[in-house]
């Protein structure tokens, strides 16, 4: 138990408050007051306490025992940090708003300084606390430690970047042995340990910040200092085999450009026995496709609605009220003149007119193309037979035919079957055919298969180029066979007609149409021959008087003047111009003749100005735009003030709610921190009962067939 007590340390004192007691203990929170008094040190004293610690760190005089605090000191500092923050939170409520904001700004600056100091200096490995407690340095509550920066500590200056030549341009020592795989693994392990220590520190800081209740630290975007980093090639990490070189040839000048293309010798593996492995012929090389994650239909619908482009969504009213987007000013460019594509260039009118000879030649060709087709002469006209219209053939009177119903047919067939069954069959033996005794009847002859011609596989290449020779099949002469005599002893049974599918022959509609037209023409000719034309005798011509058709005399072409469109347009214009000239000449003549007009002004009444009968303009009240805008501005400011008041009320409510939640959380945490031991559970005793099953009797297996009956 003593060892267990030494392992655990508690930050808070072991005193507890008895809430059941009636009297109040005023010194219950004395420990928290001590912590806050130790933390609230004036800035002058804090700087004095920090100076020796900083000097000790710079000179490197800090011992490992001092740098590695024990468990007790760490726990005390953690408790001091957490309780100090809680007390600071209590005191901040009494402070004014401006003072509280200043304190928050200072706390953020110190946090940023701590982070920059941690990133600049490499992480030191913490020493594990030994079981034997050694000499420890006294830790003052009020005085900050050398490892952590205070609130008013000056910001450390960044080290200046020193110029250095890159490793590519430096001449490397060829004789330097490359690191083995073990050394590389050790270096990698050290790097991982450093990263782990850094992560632990960050986690501790975040945990302390979460316990204290301060909000997330807002990091200022500080431009980091450029640090020169050497080139690191992947080939340097490979384990290389270095041959033992003689001592005399330690250094040789190597051409850098030529050495770039040379590859290092690959490590030679030791000759070992070949391990036979089975062939995995059944396994394929195809990778198994991973099953896609299940997505519900609701999620698919949501993703589909989100992925729809913006042009298909409804436009918001706010965007429409914003107004049109500012139009970019486009500079005017020079216009490139182009020739117009006029359609009049494509118009072509016939210049030459056809002459009378050409027109006659065309008409003659048209007459020659027309062919007169005479009908055949009916032979009956020349025979002198009496040509009369044919009488239509007299049709026979319709005879009534009864209906052939399927039911009646079936009834008749049944009656016939009954009649046939009634006839007694008498067997009459007939002589056996002699062919059955001499030859084999009813068994088909065995077909002789063709003899296989052997081909060597080595001549396969020759047969690739040459085409296979087509074997000419001999036309089989159809053998005339007599029908076999039926066996008269067996009754005759007719074979049923097999239902065969009709073979579809190729056809074309053009051939069918052509055949139909030929049949139609043939039928028309037959009808034309049957019909007899009515004979109409022509009058006898007068052989004494020859009547010739009148000769048509064509009138000679009369010359007419050309009626041009230009003349039509020019004539009215000329007429109008002549008329204008005549009118002008007439006016000039009239103006040249002087005619004095009578003096009428003397007899007229003198001019008297008249008074205007319009009424005076009535003044109306007006409202200035400035007054209107001033009223609107007052209303707007009033609404803004109301909004700000509402906002401040809401913020105050949220702040009070958060404070109440924090109080509840603190009270809940205090209740949870009190350890309450649970009683040892009591279980029922296990009653061991002996099993009733008999022991198994071993029997030797009979694998052979000798013992089987």
Curated annotation (Swiss-Prot):
Record PTM: Phosphorylated during mitosis. Hyperphosphorylated upon assembly of microtubules.
GO terms, biological process: cell division; regulation of mitotic spindle organization
Alphabetic keyword roster: Cell cycle, Cell division, Cytoplasm, Cytoskeleton, Microtubule, Mitosis, Nucleus, Phosphoprotein
Record's GO cellular component terms: cytoplasm; microtubule; nucleus; spindle pole
Sequence segments annotated as region (Disordered): 40-189, 229-249, 309-347, 641-668
Chain intervals with Polar residues compositional bias: 336-345
InterPro entries: Aurora-A-bd, TPX2_C, TPX2_central_dom, TPX2_fam
Ranges annotated as biased composition (Basic residues): 87-105
Keyword Cell division: yes
Location of Phosphoserine modifications: 206
Compositionally biased tracts (Basic and acidic residues): 106-117, 179-189
Subcellular location: Nucleus; Cytoplasm, Cytoskeleton, Spindle; Cytoplasm, Cytoskeleton, Spindle pole
Subunit structure: Associates with microtubules. Interacts with aurka and plk1. Interacts with kif15.
Function of the molecule: Spindle assembly factor. Required for normal assembly of mitotic spindles. Mediates the binding kif15 and aurka to spindle microtubules. Required for targeting kif15 to microtubule minus ends. Activates aurka by promoting its autophosphorylation and protects the phosphorylated residue against dephosphorylation.
Entry's family note: Belongs to the TPX2 family.
Protein name: Targeting protein for Xklp2
Species of origin: Xenopus tropicalis (Western clawed frog)
Gene coding for it: tpx2
């Amino acid at each position: 138990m003593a060892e267990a007590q030494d392992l655990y340390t508690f930050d808070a004192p072991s005193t507890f408050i008895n809430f059941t007691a009636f009297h109040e203990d005023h010194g219950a929170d004395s420990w928290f007051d001590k912590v806050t008094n130790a933390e609230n040190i004036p800035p002058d004293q804090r700087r004095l306490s920090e100076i020796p610690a900083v000097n000790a760190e710079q000179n490197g005089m800090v011992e490992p025992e001092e740098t590695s605090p024990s468990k007790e000191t760490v726990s005390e500092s953690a408790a001091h940090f957490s309780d100090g923050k809680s007390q600071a939170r209590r005191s901040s409520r009494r402070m004014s708003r401006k003072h509280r904001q200043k304190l928050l700004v200072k706390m953020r600056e110190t946090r940023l300084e701590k982070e920059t100091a941690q990133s600049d200096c490499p992480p030191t490995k913490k020493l594990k606390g030994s079981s034997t407690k050694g000499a420890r340095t006294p830790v003052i509550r009020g005085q900050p430690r050398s490892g952590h920066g205070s609130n008013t500590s000056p910001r450390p200056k960044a080290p200046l970047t020193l110029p250095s030549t890159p490793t590519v341009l430096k001449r490397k020592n060829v004789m330097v042995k490359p690191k083995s795989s073990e050394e590389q693994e050790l270096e990698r392990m050290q790097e991982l340990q450093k990263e782990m220590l850094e992560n632990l520190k960050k986690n501790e800081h975040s945990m302390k910040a979460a316990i204290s209740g301060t909000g997330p630290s807002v990091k200022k975007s500080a431009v980091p200092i450029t640090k020169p980093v050497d080139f690191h090639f992947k080939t340097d990490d490979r384990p290389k085999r270095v041959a033992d070189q003689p001592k005399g040839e330690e250094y040789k000048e190597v051409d850098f450009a030529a050495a770039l293309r040379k590859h290092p010798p690959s490590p030679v593996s030791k000759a070992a026995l070949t391990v036979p492995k089975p062939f995995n012929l059944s396994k394929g090389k195809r990778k198994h496709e991973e099953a896609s994650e299940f997505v519900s239909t609701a999620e698919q619908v949501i993703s589909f609605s989100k992925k729809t482009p913006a042009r298909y969504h409804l436009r918001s009213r706010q965007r429409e009220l914003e107004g049109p987007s500012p139009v970019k000013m486009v500079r005017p460019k020079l216009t490139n003149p182009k020739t117009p594509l006029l359609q009049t260039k494509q118009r072509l009118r016939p210049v030459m007119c056809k002459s009378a000879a050409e027109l006659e030649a065309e008409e003659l060709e048209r007459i020659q193309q027309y062919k007169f087709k005479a009908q055949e002469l009916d032979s009956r006209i020349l025979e002198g037979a009496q040509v009369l219209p044919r009488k239509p053939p007299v049709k026979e009177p319709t005879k009534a035919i009864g209906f052939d119903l399927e039911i009646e047919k079936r009834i008749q067939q049944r009656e016939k079957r009954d009649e046939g069954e009634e006839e007694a069959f008498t067997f009459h033996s007939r002589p056996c055919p002699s062919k059955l005794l001499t030859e084999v009847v009813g068994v088909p002859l065995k077909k002789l298969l063709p003899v296989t011609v052997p081909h060597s596989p080595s001549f396969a290449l020759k047969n690739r180029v040459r085409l296979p020779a087509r074997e000419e099949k001999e036309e089989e002469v159809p053998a005339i066979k007599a029908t076999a005599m039926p066996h008269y002893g067996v009754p005759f049974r007719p074979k049923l007609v097999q239902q065969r599918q009709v073979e579809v022959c190729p056809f074309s509609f053009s051939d069918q149409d052509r055949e139909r037209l030929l049949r139609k023409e043939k039928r028309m000719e037959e009808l034309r021959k049957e019909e007899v034309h009515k004979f109409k005798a022509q009058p006898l011509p007068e052989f004494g008087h020859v009547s010739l058709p009148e000769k048509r005399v064509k009138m000679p072409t009369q010359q007419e003047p050309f009626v041009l469109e230009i003349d039509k347009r020019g004539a009215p214009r000329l007429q109008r111009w002549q008329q204008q000239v005549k009118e002008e000449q007439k006016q000039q003549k009239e103006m040249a003749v002087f005619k004095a007009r009578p003096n009428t002004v003397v007899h007229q009444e003198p001019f008297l100005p008249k008074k205007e009968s319009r009424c005076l303009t009535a003044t109306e009240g007006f409202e200035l735009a400035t007054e209107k805008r001033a009223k609107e501005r007052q209303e707007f400011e009033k609404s803004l003030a109301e909004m700000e008041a509402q906002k401040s009320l809401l913020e105050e409510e949220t702040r009070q709610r958060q404070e109440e939640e924090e109080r509840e959380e603190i009270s809940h945490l205090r209740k949870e921190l009190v350890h309450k031991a649970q009683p040892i559970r009591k279980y029922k005793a296990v009653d061991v009962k002996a099993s009733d099953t008999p022991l198994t009797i071993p029997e030797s297996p009979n694998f052979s067939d000798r013992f089987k009956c």
